[in-house]
């Protein structure tokens, strides 16, 4: 007769979302609450393919926000709501890291647009983009309360801290990194080896890249020898 062996299991809290099976909006909010992970993956992808130092600084800002949240949680030690007893054992809830992440990112992107560090081809598109970012941030914040991962107070504090850190990190990028650190990085042999660049001064980056690529393609096509049968 085989002996049954039971092993205690745990989970990766970052990607695991619990919700009540009879909640009609539970699955939707579970997906909404994962938006910060999608944004982080998107930023990393941009870094790998664009090699822009400002994008790298945005990612560093997200790490700065997360580290700040970790320190605050360990210092405050306020538990999550009592709905899920197992979640209370995993980590603390004050402040909400998801809410902090989203509002940090939304504020930072908005400030970049207002300073014209991010340019769009139309006037209405940036307004829609900024509004959509804050809509997502509010949606993520609500999902944390709806899924009983945080209290309303924890979400509010996380959102407020994210907004404050967004302003602070924008100042770090604009007044320290961009004038002093970025030129050193992009002109350093290591920076050149990895093709690091700063494209923040280009008026319309999308149009600039499109025009240059198309001109290069035309030049290549003109120099190609004509094949004859």
Curated annotation (Swiss-Prot):
Annotated keywords: Endoplasmic reticulum, Hydrolase, Membrane, Transmembrane, Transmembrane helix
GO BP terms in the entry: protein N-linked glycosylation
Pathway(s) of this molecule: Protein modification; protein glycosylation
Membrane-spanning residues: 27-47, 94-114, 120-140, 156-176
EC number(s) given by UniProt: 3.6.1.43
GO molecular function: dolichyldiphosphatase activity
Top-level taxonomic group: Eukaryota
UniProt keyword Protein transport, yes or no: no
Catalysis performed (reactions): a di-trans,poly-cis-dolichyl diphosphate + H2O = a di-trans,poly-cis-dolichyl phosphate + phosphate + H(+)
Annotated coiled-coil segments of the chain: none
Main location: endoplasmic reticulum
Cellular component aspect of the GO annotation: endoplasmic reticulum membrane
Subcellular location: Endoplasmic reticulum membrane
InterPro entries (alphabetical): Dolichyldiphosphatase_PAP2, P_Acid_Pase_2/haloperoxi_sf, P_Acid_Pase_2/haloperoxidase
Membrane topology of the entry: Multi-pass membrane protein
Similarity field: Belongs to the dolichyldiphosphatase family.
Task of the protein: Required for efficient N-glycosylation. Necessary for maintaining optimal levels of dolichol-linked oligosaccharides. Hydrolyzes dolichyl pyrophosphate at a very high rate and dolichyl monophosphate at a much lower rate. Does not act on phosphatidate.
Name of the protein in question: Dolichyldiphosphatase 1
Organism: Dictyostelium discoideum
Species lineage: Eukaryota, Amoebozoa, Evosea, Eumycetozoa, Dictyostelia
This protein's encoding gene: dolpp1
